[in-house]
């Protein structure tokens, strides 16, 4: 029996890419399965590469993996604080798209049965649409199992009126939270801003309640990476979790305008000794002001290590403008910096991160701790130094440094939040230099543990590996639910 899943990714380039990779993996593993991906209008205009990527997806549609692009006609420009409103506005469009899909299938013999919705972690309001059609909902969670478990626990504490974290003082709090899914007490001051801010906390608590309505949750993680968390989740009263990662976009993301830059960077790396270069890159939304840039430059020069630095100027409003290039680096960097470091360092703007991490010359990665970047570094066996900037990255830093021992810390506690516009404290050159020296130690325990975890990540995706097994269990569960749905419909019809 053929069956189909309807995927609804969050309208942002990073989430869309991850969802597409998940969909490709599923159809590759199960010949009876087809997938329709409904692409919603993006919240922010001008995301780098978004329009070209969506156009390429549309052109690649086939009978196993289709892309339904919802028009952005009359789409208002909105701020991040109205994500929930944006998703609610899309419900009628999703409803009509699915209804048309069902109508098309009803007129064609041997058409697949729709087996359910697979929703992005930020699209949980679409559960209501799935329920209207009588379809079960599953979720694709693009972050770690750890932050999923913490969100559940915060929601439970809020429902019991036991969560008393104050937005006004959490950054200076000495209190800790004992999350049952973590082996160590979690400092309140390390909470993601969204789990402390008055504006955001209700949004995430409501999301967590919706998470509990799912039939199952696909998580972009590896059983061997988060065993303590996954063991807890498997014994709790939450939906079953399927760790199917690492799910990475490792193909060349071709962009003709950047091909020459890519080649120049890779040629430079190819001339460096193995494991000798520290790579600094902070994601598409990571940038710094002039004072912080100078501190980084001083640290790099003092360390004496070879470096590749993806340097970008901080944006005054991240939702209206992504970080960009400095007009004149000579005016920003310490006087004579380029002359003194020309033989050991290279300062760039945009970076082909996957290609860089895959190069044997890279020996360490100073990162914002985005979950995709974290998984990429583990996949290529590159140890990291944690410099969280926004979203759940403070948690990821805690997980990698304190829980797992797979990263070195630059500083223990981080103030401010890029997305919320909260000022971040300047990290000193001394702190950065110390972390780089620790990161680049060739025989460190962290490096050995990262190499071991890299091997486990590769094995997880092989036949018989933990992630392959989890993926197969998910497919079997979806197929089993179709049979259950058919029996329910038959029972109703007999009545």
Curated annotation (Swiss-Prot):
EC no. given is 2.4.1.-
Q: Name one GO molecular function term.
A: UDP-glucosyltransferase activity
Family indicated by similarity: Belongs to the UDP-glycosyltransferase family.
Q: Which PROSITE patterns match?
A: UDPGT
Q: Name one GO cellular component term.
A: cytosol
- What name goes with this protein? UDP-glycosyltransferase 71B7
In which domain of life is the source organism classified?
Eukaryota
What organism is listed for this UniProt entry?
Answer: Arabidopsis thaliana (Mouse-ear cress)
What S-S linkages are listed for this chain? none
Residues involved in UDP-alpha-D-glucose binding: 284, 351-353, 368-376, 390-393
One Pfam family in the UniProt entry? UDPGT
* Database matches in CDD domains: GT1_Gtf-like
Keywords for the protein's UniProt record, in alphabetical order: Glycosyltransferase, Transferase
Q: Which InterPro entries match?
A: UDP-glycosyltransf_plant, UDP_glucos_trans, UDP_glycos_trans_CS
Q: Which PANTHER family match?
A: GLYCOSYLTRANSFERASE
């Amino acid at each position: 029996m053929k069956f189909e899943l309807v995927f609804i990714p969050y309208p942002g380039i990073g989430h869309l890419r991850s969802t597409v990779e998940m969909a490709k993996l599923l159809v590759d593993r199960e010949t009876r399965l087809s997938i329709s991906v409904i692409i919603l209008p993006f919240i922010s205009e001008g995301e780098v590469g978004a329009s070209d990527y969506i156009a390429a997806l549309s052109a690649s549609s086939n009978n196993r993996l289709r892309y339904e692009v919802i028009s952005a006609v009359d789409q208002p420009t909105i701020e991040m604080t109205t994500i929930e409103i944006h998703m609610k506005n899309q419900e009628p469009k999703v409803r009509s798209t699915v209804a048309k899909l069902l109508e098309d299938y009803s007129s064609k013999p041997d058409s697949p049965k729709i087996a359910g919705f697979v929703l992005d972690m930020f699209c949980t309001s679409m559960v209501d649409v799935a329920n209207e059609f009588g379809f079960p909902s599953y979720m694709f969670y693009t972050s770690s199992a750890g932050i999923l478990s913490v969100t559940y626990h915060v929601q439970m504490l809020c429902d019991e009126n036991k969560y008393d974290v104050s937005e006004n003082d959490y950054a200076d709090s000495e209190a800790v939270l004992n999350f049952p899914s973590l082996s160590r007490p979690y400092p309140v001051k390390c909470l993601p801003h969204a789990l402390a801010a008055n504006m955001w906390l209700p949004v995430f608590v409501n999301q967590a309640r919706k998470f509990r309505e799912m039939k199952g949750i696909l998580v972009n993680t590896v059983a061997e990476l988060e065993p303590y968390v996954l063991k807890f989740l498997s014994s709790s009263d939450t939906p079953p979790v399927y760790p199917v990662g690492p799910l990475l976009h490792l193909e060349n993301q071709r962009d003709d305008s950047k091909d020459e830059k890519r080649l120049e960077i890779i040629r430079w790396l190819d001339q460096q000794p193995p494991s000798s270069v520290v790579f600094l890159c902070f994601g598409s939304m990571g940038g710094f002001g002039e004072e912080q840039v100078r501190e980084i430059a001083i640290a790099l020069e003092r360390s004496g290590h070879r470096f590749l630095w993806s340097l970008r100027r901080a944006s005054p409003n991240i939702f209206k403008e992504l970080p960009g290039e400095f007009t004149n680096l000579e005016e920003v960097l310490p006087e004579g910096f380029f002359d003194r470091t020309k033989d050991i360092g290279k300062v760039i703007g945009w970076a082909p991160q996957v290609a860089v991490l895959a190069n044997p010359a890279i020996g360490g990665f100073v990162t914002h701790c985005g979950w995709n970047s974290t998984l990429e570094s583990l996949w290529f066996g590159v140890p990291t130094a944690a410099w969280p900037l926004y979203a759940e990255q403070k948690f990821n830093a805690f997980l990698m440094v304190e829980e797992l021992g797979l990263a070195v810390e630059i500083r223990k506690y981080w103030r401010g939040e890029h997305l919320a516009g909260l000022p971040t404290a300047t990290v000193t050159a001394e702190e950065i230099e110390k972390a780089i020296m620790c990161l680049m130690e060739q025989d460190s325990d962290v490096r050995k543990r990262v190499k071991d975890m890299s091997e486990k990540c590769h094995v997880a995706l092989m036949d018989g590996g933990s992630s392959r097994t989890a993926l197969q269990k998910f497919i079997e569960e979806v197929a089993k639910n179709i049979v259950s749905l058919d029996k329910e419909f038959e029972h109703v019809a007999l009545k």
